Amino acid sequence: MSDQRAQEMIDLGNKLFAKKEPLNSLHQEIALQFYPVRATFTMSGDYLGRDHADHLNDSYPVLVRRELGNSISSTLRPRDQKWFLATSLDEDRDQDPDNARYLEYVSQTIRTAMYDVRAKFVRATKEGDHDFITFGQCVLSVEESPDRQHLYYRAHHLRDCAWLENNIGDVDHIHRKDRMSARTMKRSFKESALHQSVKDACKNDPGQEFNVRCVMMPSDEYDYTGPDAKTKGRKAPFIMCYVDADNGKMLAEIPSPDFIFVVPRWQTLPGLQYAVSPATSVALPDGRLAQTMALMIMEAGEKAIDPPTAADGDVFKEFNLQAGAMTWADLQGDRKISDVFQTIPINADMRTAFAMRADLREMLAKAFFIDKLNLPQVGPDMTATEVRARLEEHVRQLLPLFEPMEHEYNARLLDKTFFRLRAMNRFRTDIMPDTLSGADIAWGFRNPLQEASTRILVQQFREAIEVETGAANMGVGVMRTDLGIARDDAVRGIGVPAKWRRSNEDMEAEGQAKAKAAAIAKAAQEASAVAGIAQQAGDAAQSMRMGGLLPAPSKPGVEDEMTELPDEPEYVDFEDVAA
């Protein structure tokens, strides 16, 4: 039964790859013009050591594609910054300091795992970035290492992958071609699953390679008919099959809790599971023209520097114009060299050619969004409104470029990474706040695009302060803006770490303590003022007695001394006053 399933997987994959052949031809042409080292879609045989750019006359199309490909990592995944942050998709819940600290802990754990040198995340995403820019899509996988000590990221050649979408437009069924040596197959699969030819190769030629198909699909699609329908992989949503395509033998059937492949797609078209690159799709004619124009300019330059010549064949038997060379001429009579040899003047207008090339390169730069990558220049004389307008325009221009990359590319990579790390028990659940229990984890991003949006938020906060201050100076009622909330939004917007922020309870306790201290100080000030008034009154009465304006007080008798005891002193409890 397993061999029958193996043949079914091979036949299904063959159909998918046959339908994909025209796309491979297009990708080959695109790669020849913009990504020569990747121009292996229709090649067969050993291409190692080949000069991939021997057909090019102008390197500019390759350079602009390379610049855009490199900008993905530097813009969306800067290594020196925390470019992503876990979120629960609930702003009120995320604002809680305890929740924010745990989400920051999750983000740091993922970042540590991704940038582990053994995970090869940077290498895989660098390959994927250039495929994504050039061909509009790429294929990566997020796997556990065999010892389950770290993750392992891989990028796969688009030529070797074919996939299908489900009914909601997600890729959940993929066929991948691979070549494994007999030695690797023996180490990776059971001895009983290997074909006899593989076993013989292990003894005689361990380096002999065999064609292997890696097929991953939902479990409910795998063998959905027959007596064993939906029995394999029922405990897991997906199943991975390894098939010996040369011998039609099933090597392994491995249930999987998730779909390990990530297939980011830049611009999709209705009814197609494959995407296109909006950059190379419009730049391909200009790329071809750039090569033709470069050849034309080189020929014109050669003619201008080393123009063609004309000579009398009867005079010159053998013509040699090399430096220091001698040419024998049979001159008869009074004939001169200038009479039998002359240079054909070529008046090439190179300025026109250079202007045409500059215009072509400008179009290529626009096709690859090079003119929109840098932040707008802000002058010292610009007003806040002008700065804000430029930043908003910059964000609008970059959205078509980077928005699909964040959602289709980075977010899906983070989802797979989070799922794998959770399966490896890399997250501490004992410190998770109860309010985050059962919450879905999503991702927010920090990059120049988000930085531009953050600058807009901070600018709005500053403008609000200016408006409220001006209104207060003019005596216009109560302040409309809640500056506390606005300040908190601005602080979160500029990316202040969660561990810097104080909890609401701490801030409330400090506020109460400050209010109590202020009340005590006020009560003490009032008591001091009362004592001062009493002292002034006593001094005034004494002065009036000395001046004869008031009679001197009579001396009390013994009985008065016994009966007229001094009043008990009055004590002021400042805490009661403050309360």
Short names for language-model regions:
Residues 1-205, 579:
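Extended, helix-rich architectural segments
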Residues 95-144, 274-309, 345-378, 387-421:
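Long, contiguous amphipathic alpha-helices that act as assembly "spine/axial" helices in icosahedral shell
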Residues 119, 133, 137, 149-159, ...:
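Flexible, active-site-adjacent loop/turn segments at secondary-structure boundaries
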Residues 14-17, 143-324:
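Structured, contiguous alpha/beta core segments that scaffold functional sites
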Residues 3-11, 38-55, 66-79, 96-101, ...:
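Charged, low-complexity, helix/coiled-coil-prone segments
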Residues 1-26, 34-35, 39, 308-579:
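C-terminal anchoring/interaction modules
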Residues 67-75, 123-132, 212, 284-288, ...:
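Generic hydrophobic, helix-prone segments enriched in Leu/Val/Ile
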Residues 135, 209, 436-438:
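A general secondary-structure signal for short beta-strands and their flanking turns/coil
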